[in-house]
A protein has these predicted regions:
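Conserved catalytic-core segment of nucleotide-activated headgroup transferases in glycan assembly
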Residues: 399-413, 527, 540-622, 696
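Membrane-interface aromatic/basic loop that binds lipid-linked glycans or pyrophosphate carriers
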Residues: 299-383, 391, 409, 413
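Catalytic binding pocket for nucleotide-activated donors in carbohydrate/polymer assembly enzymes
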Residues: 654-727
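Donor-binding/catalytic cores of nucleotide-activated saccharide
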Residues: 94-231, 235-256
C-alpha cells in the first residue's frame, strides 16, 4: 500500500496539466499513488497519461455520462484511494519538491490533518521560484503573512465547540481566522488521514460547481481532533494569466455563481453545530463577502438584479447568522448588515456611500495624486466633449517622439487652426507648432482625457480612463512584433500579472490600430484579440526615413551631438527583460556587450550610439568611454538616430524592423536567446533563419562581424531583401498623411 493517495481531477488546459505532472515527478517523496479522474476532457491527453503512467503508480478513472465537476472527481478519488493519507491537487497547480516529504514527517505526530502553506502565483514554477528568491510576494500571500504575524499560535490544534471548552474554542477560532487555507475552507495544501475521512464519511456536494470545498472542509474541521502546521510544505495555487480565454475555475464568470455561493453556505450550515466554531467562521465569511464585495455592487452596479433578486437572496442567507458574529465588525458594517436583514435597500446604500466616502478620504489623505482621478470621474466626465481637441501621448509621456509625433506635425502643418492639439509630456518638454503641453496624471491631463474628441497614443491608455461615447481612439502601437505579445504569451513574467485581463479591457476602447505590414495585421488580430479597424499604411515614425531631406537632417543631428565627421556610427539598441524589473514599467538592465573591448578594437573607425528601451530605469555607466560611446537613451526620437547610424546592433527589440527601411547592416547580439525564447516571451519568427543579419553570442563575435561588415552584407543580401519586402512593404513616407486623412475627416 502506498503512503499517500494524490487525487488529481482533470477537465481542460493540457499545458497546465503537463506542468503539474512535471513538477510532481520532481518530488523528493516517491511513495504515492496518483489517482487521475477525468471530467470528460475536451483535449487529447492520452500521450501525457501514457508518458507519466510509466513514472508514477497511476490509476485513471473517468466520470460517467451526466456526472461532472471537481466535486464528483474528488469523491471518486476518495472512494478509489488506497493510501494511508489523502492529498488533493488541482491540475493547474503544483507542489514544491519537499512538500510531501515534510508533510509525511509531520504525520509521525499522529494527527488527523497536516496543514501546509498555500501560496498563490500567476507563474510557472521556474518564474515563481525566481520571484520568491527576489522576495516578490503575491498580494494574497502578503495578506496572510500579516495576519499570522499579528496572531502567533501553537502549531497543535484541537477543535472543540463552545460547550466543551470555551477557551480552546476561542484559540481555534483565531487559528481558523489566520490560516487562509483553513479560513477560506479550501481542501488544497492539506494532508488528510484517510481513515479519519472515510470513518466520518466526508464527501463533496456534487451539486456545487464552484463552492464544494466548504461542504467537505467544514464538517471535517468540526470533527478534527488534532492538526499540525508545517511551514515548509508549500502548495502553489496558480492563477491563470489569461482569464479571458483560459479562466481557472475561480476566475470563471457565471451568472449562477452568486446563487451557488448562498446555496452552498446554507447547505453547509445544516452539517454543522449551530454553536460551534466552524459555524461561527462560516457565518463570518458570508458577512465579510457582503460587507466587502456585494454591498458595493448594490450601490454601483448597472444591473438592477443586485438591488432586487440578489439583494433578497443575500438577505435570506445573512438571516441565518449568529448575532455574536457581528461583534468584531465596525459600527458602519454592523448597521449595513442590520439594514440588509430589515430589507432596507436605501439604508444599505447609505452605509456603502459612507464607507466609500471614508475610504476615498483616506486615499486622498495618504496620496493626493488620486484627486485628479476623482475630478476625472465626478467632474470632468460630465462636461461636453470638445470636437476639435486631440490628445497625444508617447511612451507614457516620457518623450516627444514616435508615430504620434509625426501624425501631430502633419496635422499642424496641413490643418493649421482646425484642431486644438494637446501633448501629455513630463520633464518640461517643448513641442513645436503651438500645442498645449500637460503633465501626465495631472488635473489638466485628467480634464483632457475626459473632454478630448480624439486620442493618438503609442502605448496603452491609463487603466482608470473610461472612454466616452463619441470619443475616437487611435492606437499606433510602437513596433512590429518580434516578441510574443499579450494573448500569444503563455507566461506573463512582467511586473503586472493581470496584464492580459487589463489589456483585454483597454483594447476594447481602440477605434483604430496602426499596422506597418501584413505580418503585423495578422499578429495584432491574434495577440490583442483586436477586431476593429486596421490602418495599414506603415508607421508614421518611419516617414522621416523616406523624406527627400533626410541626409540634411542626419548631417545637422551629427553636428548637434558632436559626432566626428570622420567616424562611422554603430547604434546599439537593446530591449528590456520581462523578469528583471523594479516595479510596474521600470525594468532593470545589465549591459552585457563589452564596450571597452569595442573601443579598443573599433575606435579608430567607429563610435557607438547607445539607446536603451524607454522601459529601462537603469542609467548605463559609460565612464572611461568618453568620445567613443554617446549615450542617447534620453534622446526623444530614435527615428532621427536611425538616420545617423551606419550599423544597428540589437537583440529582441523591434528597432530592426524600422531600421531595415534604410537597408543598412543589422547585427543581433543574442547572448541570452535560449532564456528569452523558452522562459520569457518566445518569438513570432525564427531568428535563426528570418532576421536580416547574424546572431552573435559574445562581444568578440560582435567586434569580428563589424570588422568584416562587407562580408556580412554580402552573406545576408538575399535574406535582407526578402525581409524588406515582407516587413517594410507599407512604409513609403506617407503614413501620417493617410492616417490623418482617414481619421480626422
Amino acid at each position: 500500500m502506498r503512503t499517500i493517495s494524490i487525487i488529481l481531477p482533470f477537465f481542460k488546459y493540457k499545458h497546465y496539466f503537463k506542468e503539474c505532472l512535471q513538477n510532481l515527478a520532481q518530488s523528493t517523496f516517491k511513495d504515492f499513488e496518483l489517482i487521475v479522474v477525468l471530467d470528460h476532457p475536451t483535449e487529447d491527453i492520452d500521450d501525457l497519461l501514457e508518458e507519466y503512467n510509466s513514472i508514477f503508480d497511476m490509476r485513471i478513472y473517468t466520470l460517467p455520462e451526466g456526472v461532472t465537476g471537481v466535486a464528483a472527481c474528488r469523491n471518486v478519488g476518495i472512494q478509489q484511494a488506497k493510501g494511508a493519507y489523502l492529498y488533493f491537487l488541482d491540475s493547474d497547480d503544483y507542489v514544491l519538491e519537499d512538500t510531501l516529504q515534510n508533510m509525511i514527517k509531520a504525520m509521525d505526530h499522529d494527527v488527523d490533518m497536516v496543514n501546509g502553506v498555500l501560496n498563490h502565483t500567476w507563474n510557472n514554477k521556474a518564474n515563481y521560484l525566481h520571484k520568491v528568491e527576489n522576495k516578490e510576494v503575491d498580494e494574497e500571500d502578503q495578506e496572510e503573512r500579516e495576519q499570522r504575524r499579528l496572531n502567533k499560535l501553537s502549531d497543535f490544534v484541537s477543535f472543540a465547540s463552545y460547550e466543551k471548552d470555551e477557551q480552546q474554542a476561542q484559540a481555534n477560532f483565531y487559528t481558523m481566522d489566520n490560516r487562509r487555507g483553513i479560513r477560506t475552507f479550501t481542501v488544497l495544501g492539506n494532508l488528510y488521514n484517510r481513515d479519519f475521512v472515510v470513518r466520518n464519511n466526508f464527501k463533496f456536494n456534487e451539486n456545487f460547481r464552484y463552492y464544494s470545498d466548504m461542504t467537505f472542509m467544514c464538517p471535517l474541521l468540526e470533527k478534527l481532533n488534532t492538526s499540525l502546521r508545517v511551514e515548509d510544505a508549500i502548495y502553489v495555487k496558480r492563477k491563470h494569466n489569461d482569464p479571458i480565454n483560459e479562466p481557472a475555475l475561480s476566475q470563471e464568470e457565471n451568472d449562477n455563481r452568486f446563487n451557488e455561493r448562498c446555496d452552498a453556505v446554507e447547505y453547509t450550515r445544516t452539517l454543522l453545530k449551530e454553536e460551534g466554531v466552524v459555524r461561527f467562521c462560516l457565518d463570518r465569511k458570508i458577512v465579510s463577502y457582503f460587507v466587502s464585495k456585494m454591498s458595493k455592487r448594490i450601490r454601483r452596479s448597472q444591473d438592477d438584479l443586485w438591488r432586487t433578486d440578489y439583494f433578497e437572496r443575500i438577505a435570506k442567507t445573512i438571516d441565518g447568522i449568529r448575532p455574536e458574529v457581528m461583534n468584531r465588525y465596525k459600527r458602519n458594517s454592523k448597521k449595513m448588515v442590520a439594514c440588509l436583514q430589515n430589507r432596507d435597500l436605501k439604508g444599505v446604500q447609505s452605509c456603502v456611500r459612507r464607507k466609500l466616502g471614508i475610504k476615498k478620504f483616506f486615499r486622498v489623505f495618504k496620496n493626493k495624486n488620486v484627486l485628479f482621478k476623482l475630478a476625472y470621474y465626478h467632474i470632468y466626465s460630465k462636461k461636453p466633449i470638445q470636437d476639435n481637441v486631440i490628445l497625444f501621448e508617447t511612451f507614457m509621456a516620457k518623450n516627444y517622439s514616435d508615430s504620434p509625433k509625426y501624425i501631430y506635425e502633419y496635422i499642424a502643418k496641413n490643418y493649421p487652426g482646425k484642431y486644438k492639439c494637446v501633448w501629455a509630456l513630463n520633464d518640461g518638454h517643448e513641442v513645436p507648432y503651438g500645442a498645449e503641453v500637460v503633465k501626465r496624471f495631472s488635473f489638466k491631463y485628467a480634464y483632457y482625457l475626459a473632454v478630448s474628441k480624439y486620442f493618438v497614443f503609442n502605448v496603452r491608455q491609463p487603466l482608470w480612463y473610461r472612454k466616452r461615447e463619441g470619443q475616437v481612439f487611435v492606437e499606433t502601437w510602437h513596433g512590429t512584433p518580434l516578441k510574443r505579445l499579450v494573448f500569444d504569451q503563455e507566461e506573463v513574467t512582467s511586473a503586472s500579472p493581470k496584464y492580459k485581463q487589463q489589456f483585454y479591457r483597454q483594447r476594447q476602447e481602440w477605434d483604430y490600430l496602426v499596422s506597418a505590414n501584413p505580418f503585423s495585421t495578422k499578429t495584432f488580430r491574434s495577440c490583442f484579440m483586436y477586431e476593429g479597424k486596421m490602418l495599414e499604411y506603415g508607421y508614421p515614425r518611419n516617414d522621416i526615413l523616406y523624406w527627400p531631406n533626410k541626409d540634411e537632417i542626419a548631417k545637422d543631428l551629427r553636428k548637434k551631438l558632436g559626432i566626428p565627421e570622420d567616424k562611422k556610427t554603430i547604434l546599439y539598441a537593446p530591449t528590456w527583460r520581462d523578469d528583471e524589473h523594479y516595479g510596474k514599467g521600470e525594468y532593470k538592465f545589465t549591459l552585457a556587450l563589452d564596450l571597452k573591448l569595442m573601443m579598443e578594437k573599433l575606435s579608430d573607425e567607429y563610435v557607438v550610439l547607445l539607446r536603451t528601451h524607454h522601459y529601462i530605469a537603469d542609467n548605463i555607466d559609460t565612464t572611461g568611454l568618453e568620445g567613443f560611446v554617446y549615450n542617447l537613451s534620453k534622446y526623444d526620437d530614435i527615428s532621427e538616430i536611425y538616420l545617423i547610424s551606419d550599423i544597428c546592433i540589437t537583440d529582441y527589440s523591434s528597432v530592426f524592423f524600422d531600421f531595415a527601411n534604410l537597408k543598412r547592416p543589422v547585427l543581433f547580439y543574442t547572448y541570452d536567446i535560449e532564456k528569452y525564447k523558452n522562459q520569457l516571451r518566445g518569438f513570432y519568427i525564427d531568428m535563426n533563419t528570418e532576421v536580416p543579419g547574424p546572431l552573435l553570442y559574445t562581444s568578440e563575435e560582435v567586434v569580428d562581424a563589424i570588422l568584416n561588415i562587407d562580408q556580412i552584407n554580402e552573406e545576408y543580401k538575399e535574406r535582407y531583401e526578402e525581409f524588406y519586402k515582407r516587413f517594410c512593404c507599407y512604409d513609403d513616407g506617407n503614413a501620417s498623411k493617410h492616417i490623418a486623412e482617414e481619421v480626422f475627416k
